[in-house]
């Protein structure tokens, strides 16, 4: 993952929270049950947590309230500024991304929501291989993101978006790197993880991978 999305992140920073609240009709289904999705990620995490894509701090706040020690990584300067306004003053967010980041001393869980699709499938594999080296046996990766059961599910979702006049959503689905469950299952298993997938809305699945 390079810096190609940083401009988008900065632009989106000031409207992101309205998106997750369902105020944009095109993305309402993408963010359906948003709070439940965040809670599910929190409940599946434990110990010292490395969070990629802090964004405006919504998941971070829930992790902190649940007593987790959190190390936050966020590439967008604008996102970091907004998150710092919402989070405890002593909490620090480090600039970085899924592939380039400062490694904390000890990590039990790696989490992210609505962000892993910014990596190509090859980059996803590189990232998971790196995380496998950071986690001990029993350590976890818990990612919530838009993925698809198979190619047919993806094709139908894009077609439906176009039929409903949701051209921005359709373009998003066709230009970013939304992957398929079999691809992610292979990536996780090849890097020493047992993984399960739980669907929480039409778009979003929670991937819970445990290091073997």
Curated annotation (Swiss-Prot):
UniProt xrefs under Pfam families: Methyltransf_25 (PF13649)
One GO biological process term: methylation
Database matches in SUPFAM superfamilies: S-adenosyl-L-methionine-dependent methyltransferases (SSF53335)
Keywords: Methyltransferase, S-adenosyl-L-methionine, Transferase
Source species, domain of life: Bacteria
A single MF term (Gene Ontology): S-adenosylmethionine-dependent methyltransferase activity
Residues binding S-adenosyl-L-methionine: 53, 74, 97
EC number: 2.1.1.-
Family: Belongs to the methyltransferase superfamily. YrrT family.
Annotated function: Could be a S-adenosyl-L-methionine-dependent methyltransferase.
UniProt name for this protein: Uncharacterized methyltransferase BC_4369
Source organism per UniProt: Bacillus cereus (strain ATCC 14579 / DSM 31 / CCUG 7414 / JCM 2152 / NBRC 15305 / NCIMB 9373 / NCTC 2599 / NRRL B-3711)
